[in-house]
Regions:
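Catalytic metal- and UDP-sugar-binding loop of GT-A-like glycosyltransferases, i.e.
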Residues: 107
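Conserved core of the sugar-phosphate nucleotidyltransferase
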Residues: 88, 112-189
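Short, high-confidence coil segments that cap the C-terminus of an alpha-helix
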Residues: 44, 99-101, 130-131
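A short, N-terminal amphipathic alpha-helix
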Residues: 30-46, 58
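Short internal beta-strands
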Residues: 32, 47-51, 136
Length: 189
């Protein structure tokens, strides 16, 4: 049986909605939703929380996550990337935990509708198909890249982004293959 580690990240300093990860939705802090869902999963063995903010760490602990470290500030800036947060957590776990994990699932607090069924379905797909990684995606319901244009800054004219001419564009959107976009609610690897 594969051992699964859940990692829930939340940093301070949000510019769009200050303090968003601590904001209450139905009297529950946003950061608690993935912790609650992971706690109900059939497959997750341990939940760790990564943050640079002690108050968020305390909240995460109160909802059942372990908080073995405070995330270094260099991994909690506007320019920080998920990979650095993940590698920091994995390196810490590898160096400091006796138990070993086979799979990591990364759960974003900004997707509070992700529930234990979504998590278990993703992990079951991952196990069944022997995936190396898995990411959540969604079909674009409205904007197809075939209709994207770019602006020529010199002539101030638009031209198709993917095609040579506008006449090459399909008139019927139903004739286009569906396109999907990453919705990083969860990552598994």
């Amino acid at each position: 049986s594969k051992r699964v580690l859940a990692l829930v990240p939340a940093r301070s300093g949000s510019k769009g909605i200050p303090g968003k990860n601590k904001k209450l939705i139905n009297n529950i802090p946003l950061l608690a939703y993935p912790i609650i869902a992971a706690g109900k999963s059939k497959y997750i063995d341990k939940i760790i929380f990564s943050s640079d903010d002690q108050e968020m760490c305390d909240i995460a602990q109160s909802y059942g996550a372990e908080v073995p470290f405070l995330r270094p500030i260099e991994f909690a800036t506007d320019d920080s990337v998920r990979a650095d947060t993940i590698l920091h957590a994995l390196n810490y776990v590898h160096a400091n935990f006796k138990e070993k994990f086979d799979i990591l699932i990364f759960l974003e607090p900004t997707s509070p509708l992700t529930n234990e069924n979504d998590i278990d379905t993703a992990l079951e797909f991952f196990f069944t198909h022997k995936c190396q990684s898995l990411v959540s995606i969604m079909e674009s319901p409205t904007h197809h890249p075939e209709y994207a244009v770019e602006l020529d800054n010199f002539t101030k004219k638009i031209k198709p982004f993917l095609r040579k001419n506008f006449s090459d564009l399909p008139m019927n959107r139903q004739a286009l293959k569906p396109v999907y976009f990453f919705v990083v609610e969860l990552l598994v690897f």
